[in-house]
Amino acid sequence: MESRPTILVIDDEPANIEIVSAVLEEDYDICFALSGEQALEVAHASRPDLILLDVVMPGIDGYQLCRLLKADPQLCDVPVIFATALGDDEAELRGLAVGAIDYVTKPIRPATLQRRVRNHVQMKRMRDQLA
């Protein structure tokens, strides 16, 4: 039996983490980080199948963190989806330019988030099998 995929949720607002966890916890193991610095530690420890990342955070922001994740040989293949209140085209394009595979805006629409996460986790698992 295949293990449950792990999703790392990174957001400096605990309420947002709770919302995302409630949407995804039935199908995924959820771990979380409240800062970019903590996220790097948790990502190395948990080896997530997908990362949901907020943009606006103190310290290392989401764009910087995505660059760091994509530059890390152990984490560069983990898909990153930005989940943020920044809904303008420029923010979305910037997120995709730094390595995110997708971009969803808050407030989160549960069915959309579930489908996007499922699609990207399935694609990652297929890529991993081919490697």
What spans do the regions from the language model cover?
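Receiver (REC) domain active-site loop signature in two-component systems and cognate sites
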Residues: M57, G95
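Active-site beta3 strand of CheY-like receiver
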Residues: S46-V55
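Two-component/phosphorelay signaling modules centered on CheY-like receiver
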Residues: E2, P14-F32
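Short amphipathic alpha-helix used as the core "switch/output" element in two-component signaling
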Residues: E41, Y63-C76
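The feature encodes the CheY-like receiver
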Residues: P58-G59, C76, D88, K106
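Helix N-cap/capping motif at the beta->alpha junctions
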Residues: F32-E41, G62
